[in-house]
Amino acid sequence: MDTLKLHSHFENLLYVGRSVLTNTSSRIQRLFFKKEMCIYEYLFKEEASKGIEIVVDNAVLVCVFENDICNKSILYLNDSTNVTSYINYCNSTFEYDKLRDRWIMPDGYLTLFIPNDDFEKRFAFVQTLV
């Protein structure tokens, strides 16, 4: 895939990640009803959290909720081959905040995340609102 197509594809993934923010879990389920998804609830002592994982192209979109409102979206890339191109796209499109280690988007933030406990070392891009 050439650079222009890669950037366009990544831009679309970011758009999908942004589209879930501020939505309820039921609204997100309706928006992505034709996609493969996993809905889960994590319970431990007094702590409870809910999440939705949705397969989108070559990525998995994870929606993180607080009071049933998605406040964070995480795009796990299934293939890290093009991550350099995606980082270059972010560097050329968004201002980078070195102090907080994140890109500043028009209405939020974007962070590159590599989980320490993921044996596959899948890269993820995390979006949050301002």
Show the residue positions of the predicted features.
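Broad, structure-driven detector of short, well-ordered beta-strand segments within folded domains
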Residues: V60-E66, R102-P106, L110-D117
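Glycine-rich, aromatic-bearing surface loops/beta-hairpins
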Residues: L110-V130
